[in-house]
Each structure stands twice: as structure tokens, then as C-alpha cells.
From Swiss-Prot:
UniProt name for this protein: Early 94 kDa protein
UniProt entry keywords in alphabetical sequence: Early protein
Amino acid sequence: MINYYVYATDDSLSTNSDYYFNKNALQTLEQFQNEIENISSCDKVLYLHWSAYCRQKEIGDVKSRYLRRNGEGTDTRPSEFIKWIHKNINLLDGKLKLLYMVTDGQISKNEANVCKNLLNEKPFSFERIVFYAINNNTEQIDLSVASAFVNNSDCKIYRNDEMVEWVNLTKEFNYDIITTENFISKKDELLSFVRFKFINSMPTDANVLNEVDKLKRLRQRLFSEIKQTNNSSMNFDQIKNKNEFVNTFKSTEFYKTLYNADVLNFDKIIDSTISTAINYLHNRNKSYAFDVMKNLHYQNKLASVNAETDDVVANDDDEAYDYSNVENIRFPDCILANDSGVPAILLTHYNLFETIQGSLTKFKSRLEFPLLWSQNKEIKNSIEYCYNLESLKQLIQHGTRLSPRSRRPFTGAIVPNEQFDEYNDYVLACTYFDAKKVAFNAGLMYYLLYKHINDAEYIDDNVKDYFKRYVIYRINNTECMIGFSNLAMEPLIKVKLPTALWYVSEISTLLFKHDNQHFGKEKLRQFAHFAEDMLQILQWCDYTDVNVEAVKKRAYCLKRINMFKRMSVLDAVEWIANRAFECKDKFIINKLTNADALQDLKFLKVNHNGVVDEHVLNDTSINAERYLYFYHIIEDFDKYISVVDNTMRPAFVLEEGKTFYDSLLKQLQSVHFNGQEITFEKCSRLDFNRILSLHKLYIECVKSLNKYPTLEEYQNYVYNQKHVKFNRIAIFPENILQNLAAVHNEYANKIVNLPVEEFIVRANNTVNRITRIQNERVGSPLQAEEIDKLIKLSEQRVNICRK
């Protein structure tokens, strides 16, 4: 068996005449020679130059190449080195002991993939690798070349003369030896192992998924070691007093940890280290930068307001889609007092696994809190029909497995009786989870079905009441985590479902809403959209010490804040304005329909990444005009419709030396909102920013389209040009559509047999007001000086504003 010791240096064109590279690379050659001084005479030493080809050299050639600073190759292709090994070394009779790999640069993703594919076809690895990336400009070197070779070797990685990594990849990382005692000293070793072992691996590779699972188990184990205190002795389910609940929770290890800086910081170090490793493994486009793992990431986001739509980081504790099949449960042969009086609600199959869409994490969050499926119409459609128990038995005995009503497949029906609990859960598993053994929150799943059943007109009210009683029974007997989460940074306290709902809807708010550091622990931020449901269940379960109005108010605020944080300010204002004012063909008009809706404007000032300031929420004084722009109303608009043929504009000079400005000011009314109603007042000045110049907009529309617009095209043009003004949402006059139609009709009468080109010429020639007046008064012309004086006097009378 021959042991091979290989020195392979980059001979690409970029190394030619590079003093820094060749000087330092020569030192690596000397280091290599020192390492092989005592090898056996049977062993073989190889010196290789690689670039767009790979060639064997003598040691003198390599020295001479460095001393003469002569790079003879072209491209940087480590794949050529791999091909040379494949061709020239019999790996069955040889052992690759040591590789010195030296380069001055980077390779493309494509070249890295070529290397990966070559090694997949015919694998080899060196026992030890010493990798040098040498370049005076460190931005031009990375780990892309090293990535092709390192994942099964004991590796030393150098950036110039600095050893940045030393990681042994010849064996699997031993996660069992990591404890809370040695985590700090082991964390860099862990990150290095993950980085180099999987540097070119895809997130879907089996080995990657297995490593992710190991990391998650490690995180869970370490957090369990930290939180050894058992909170199960605290019976939260017996507490019905709000203050007692709050005080008892403050004595839990979870709460104490939050305010113990040493423990909390250690929690974060563990979380950020392992989350960084998992995020790296989930990344399809891994960076080759040396320091990519130096910036740690956290698993949990503070201030997550809406679990339904928030992005979830890829490293949550999801498991592979590998659920076992549910155990078959036959229809119970129960004898009830009155089978004909017991309802049975048939459910047809709808596989919720089909909704995963690549995010098992979100799917698991729905298992813990099934109300997140509230908007899923297919669940509602799966509730087929209501039979009585006697009829259902007959249906099943005949072997029928297609719904008589829709011909969709079914497994069984929900029988709202406690003797059927196991059978009902089996039916749910077969109906919604592909007959897999899935741990779902049974109480909330049955409540979700009840909501749909309660809305179904084809189901009798007596059946709804019957099913409601069963749902309450299942809710009271369902256990879950107090925060509907198994994540390590959450309180891992198992309680009855009503207790968890109380904690989520109110108790966590009392504990954390004013906490500048831990405000994200307020669970209502995450579940605000379901406040009404949670309060409904708490009422059913006789929880009386709940401030219902306070919960509703805060939930409403959090829902709005969450929605607006995903929108631009303008989009949010427009959404609010559409609810507050009447809307006609997209135009929001100054007819108020719901003044209270404008109170939502205050949520635009709330920082969703911090404590929600209740002073802002309680402030009812809204300056709507900070966000809304009210256009003036022109009374008797019909007076201003007529267009002069020569100018394609309204007449500017009127009788008795008055102008269009004088007449317009008399007809203008400004629009204001005083907090509860719209008010109007006569204008004392002519502010053209507040005036919709519909004739001018028609002319601009013709120029834009290079044709005469239809009424719809004209309306769309005006809307697009004017619905945002000074970064505010515009509120149009109530008669905007009538005015647009009138102007469009006036022009329609004027443009008969008038080519578009001629229309544009007339309009362009009369932009200047002096020229405009001269063209409209052909029969009684005025001198330019007279016109200029007329305009200035008119502007003074109306106190014109054009800014």
C-alpha cells in the first residue's frame, strides 16, 4: 500500500507576477517538505500545478515557478486536479495521506458543482488537508476551492498566514459530549464541523436532515438541563383568580430565567449558536466567505404578531414528514339509550398534509393551534351531512365509503358522545391527516369543526347544541403547552386547554406588555386574530375573572398593528380610508360612512418591534389630514365645462375684465374632517393643488395615450395621477364621476373630425396663458402687456397658490 503525499499549487494566470502570492506560497512548500522529511521510502510525494489543466512537476520546478513568479495556466479549475487523481492514482492500492492545496482565488458555483459531481462519481479523500488561500486582497479569496475536498478530512485552513480553522471531519461530531458545562468551549468546534462537513450539501440531503435533527435534539437537551426545576407541581389548572395566576407564573423557572442575566445570556448563546448551524444547513446557496458563521442568528423573533402570516425561521423544531400510520379503530359497538336521537356528523376526506407547501414548521404550528386553519374552506366543505347514529351504523354495515350526498370518500363520522372519543379521534386522523398518527390539539380541532357546523344552514340547531356540549367536554380534557409551543425558549409547562387559552389571551399580556426586553413573550401578539374564539371558550368553561373588553381592545390593536406592518403607509391609509368613506369606482369620495374607522390611523405610529405604547392606543384625537388629502369641491361645475375650439381649454377671460380664476374662487369649497364629521367652508384663496383640473388632465391623457381616451381610460388616468397627493391618500369630491363624464362628453363633441395630432398641437401651443388668451379672443385681441396685467391682477384678487 503506497502512501501519497501531494503538494498542489494554483498555476492560474492570476498568480503570474504576483509577488505576495509567490513569496508566501514558497513558504508553504518549505512547510510541506518539513512534514514529509521522515516518510517511508515506499511512500510517494507528488508535486502538481493545476489551473485549466493539471500537470505533475518536480520540486525544483515548483520552487522555480515561485521564484520566477511565473503562472503558466489560465483558469482556476480544481476539477482538473480531481481528474488527475482519478487518472493517475490507483486508489485501491494507495492511501491519500496528505494534501497541501494552495490557491490565490475563488471558483464559481458551477466549478464547485463540477468538483462535487466528479467526487460523487468516484470518491476519494485525504487523511489530512492543509489549505492555503493566499492573496494580498483578502476579498478575492474564500473557501470555494477548499469546499471541493475538505468534507472527510482532518483540515487546517489558512487565510494567508493565519490559521482560521482546524476541524477534523474524518468522523461524526459527538453531540453527546456537549453539556451546559462545556458548551462555550465546544461551540466553535461545532460550528466549524457543520460548516465544512456540509459546505456543498443541499438542504434536502438525508445527511443534512439527520444533522439538523441532531442539532435540534441538542438544543432541547441543553435547555432541559438549564431548566431542571419541574413546574408541574404548580397546578395552574386549579387557578381561577387572575392575580393568583400572574403571581404563580412569576415563580416558575421560565419566568425567573428571563430576569437572570447570566442564565438568559447563556440561553441566547445556545440558541444563537445552534440556530446559526441549522440555518446554514437549510441554506441552498451557502456562502464560501471565511467568516460567514461568525454572525450568530436567533431562533425566536420578538414581537411576532400573527402566527398565521409571519415568516417562520427555518430552524424551528419541525420534524421530518415521517409520521406512522394511525391504529385502525372499528366503529364502537355501543348501546346508547336512544341511537336515533344521537347525531353523527359525516366528514369526507381532505388531506391537510397537502397544505404544507414546503413548510412543515407552519404545519406543526397549526397542529398545536388548529384555529390557524379557520380560513381553510376545504375543512368547511368536508363537513358533509348529519345523520343519526342508527343511520350511520346502517351505512357503515353496508360497507359504504363514499358520501351518498357528494360521492366523496369518507372514513366515518363524529359521534358527539364520550364513549366514541377514540373513534372520533381516529376519524379526524383519517379525514384530515392521511390516517397518520399526528399529535393535534383535539379540543381546538373539535372547536374548529363546531364553528363550521354552527354556520351550516343544513344542520339542525339541536344538533349544533348537542355537538357544542361535546366540544366543551373535549376542550376541558385536552392538555397542551401553556403557550401552544414546544420551542425551547417558550414556557414548557403542560396545562389544560382552557388554562392555556387564558394565559395566551390575557395573563401573558399582564406579565409582558410593558416589558421593554421581553414584550415578545406576550402571546396575544401571535394569536390576536383568535381573541374572540378564545374568550368564547373561556366563557363556556366558566372563567369569570377575565377582562373581556380589555382583551378585545388589545387584540384589535395588535391585529391592526400586525396588518399595517406588512403594508406601506400609503397602502395602510388607503385601506383605512376605504372603510371610512364611500368609494365609487376606486375613487374615495368625501362622504363619510364610518368615522370610527379613521381611529385606525393611530396604529401607523406604533413601533411593532417594541412595546406597544398604550398612550398612543388610547389617544382618540386623530389628525386625519396628516394622512388624507381632501380636494376642493367646485359648485356648479357645469359652468366650467365648455371648451374653446382654438385652445382645447376652457375660456380664461370672462366678461367685465374678470377671469376664470375669479369665477372659480366663488364656487370653491374646502373640505375638512373634525374628528367625527366632514365640514365645508368657502375658500378665501385659489389653491391649485386642491383643485382637480379635469380639462388639463384630459389633455395630458390624450398625450399619454396618443389617442382620444374612452371614458373608462380617462377615469383611470385621473385616478392614477391624483389618488396620491403629497404622499397622502386623496379624497375626491362626491360628484367626481359626474364631472369626469361631463368633461369627457364636452371633448367628445369638440373632437369630431379633429385628428389627435391637431388636438395636441392646439393644446401645446396654448400652455402659455398669454398665447392662450390671444387664441381664444381672435375677434377682439389684446396686447401681451394688457394680458399680462390682467393675469397679475387676477392672481392678486384670488391670492393664488401653486406650490
